[in-house]
Amino acid sequence: MKSILFTFTLIFAVAGLPLQAVSATKLAKPNIIVILTDDLGWADLGAQGIQKDIRTPNLDALAAGGLRATSGYVTAPQCVPSRAGLLSGRSQSRFGVESNGDTLEGFDAQQTIAVRLKQAGYATGMTGKWHLGPPGKIVTHGFDDVYCNQGAAGQAWANFDLDGKTIKGAEIASPVYHLDANSAAACAFIKRHKDQPFFFYLAYRAPHVPLDATRKYLDRFPGPMPERRRQCLAMMSAVDDGVGQVMDTLRQTGLEEKTLIFFMGDNGAPLKITKEDAPGGGPGWDGSLNAPMNGEKGMLSEGGIREPWLTYWKGRIPAGQVYEHPVISLDVAATAVALAGLDRGHHAPRDGNSADLTRSVRTTLDGVNLIPFFTGENKAAPHDALYWRWVAQAAIREGQWKLLVGGPRSYLFNLETDAAEKNNLLAQHPEIAQRLRAKLETWAAELQPPGINVKPMAKTWEEYFDFYLDGKAPAPPDSANAGAKRKGKAKGKAAARPDGADE
């Protein structure tokens, strides 16, 4: 194990080695903020340099002052499993949360980042979209301060208000636009806990449908464009304003150099193949874009799981970095645990109560501490390989090579020369594909349930693979679905898919 001396002492661990618990008296623990967006496409951050219409100056400033990862991944191409993986630091397929419709019992048995950091004396809080069970249960997952407004417009489940005052946990009327409320809640939490280390999860429901930007933000994007695109740009502008407010609050409280910030999305944009500009802002394309990545939400192609990723820690992570080695959202928990001086794998109570030993669970993390890599101390790649399983799909990335399996189909891509996954090299390099599949099968044998896939490919995903990976024209909708779609339009919104792709 190596130690690094900064302005205050932090003890890290070389990736893969166990982290020993460190006395709080010997460790100045940094604050940690995780900012998560919802259904954000690869192209929709100004710092990515892809789309000229997106304007995110505050997020771009984080990229300029810190690190932008060009191969930053999430654990699933759908909201619930991706969030379960991020917050637990373990592949959600290990505990049976494979997709949005699955039971959450497996997640309920995990230690979240918040539970772990409470053991190290951290204040913990969250705001925004939870999507991992009823809002009233969030406190049982280690988050003491909650302002959750993922449900009905103008409503929130909260136990503190936007002035930072403690209230009885209950459904309340939220006084402002939900994205503005998230930003205000984050700032209130920072001020409330400025004198102790804290962990805050800022989970904006943007640009996920329903598309509901206020006029304040819509007016920033005049001119002809698809209305769903305008809504996406406006909602992301609200997020960006909020990030600016959070940074201002950190500076005003003298905490900027003591705070590590992660920013990413939960999965790629749902393009619905055709990017239809359906009226009403309901289920369908959210206006976001994945270009030049191939595919979309609901696929283990790059367009479904490679996300904009920023990491900022002033004075610790060198500014202006473009980091090319693959990293994954699982690494957030491992990094946080390392910085808090905790062990990355042990038997511990799920709810952080040391007296409640009957609720202990196996808690070994799947990620690695990224700080030695992001500071430049460790020049190697953080991971030998990254692995995914999502329902009927599985994938492995090892270096530049990626093997993608969807039902009976297999694809091999060289992401170094073909990040857009346009050229299937399976026939040219069968030996590489066989080796990667063997590694993938070994990993998948540890999952719950074991195996490369859980169920057959649904029709929706077959159509997505046909279009994005096999170059076939999209199939015309059947008469029943077309009728439902027309009916949905008549009500001012697109019809939802029956397989949960819109969730």
Language-model features and meaning:
Residues 2, 6-10, 21-410, 417-438, ...:
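Formylglycine-dependent sulfatase
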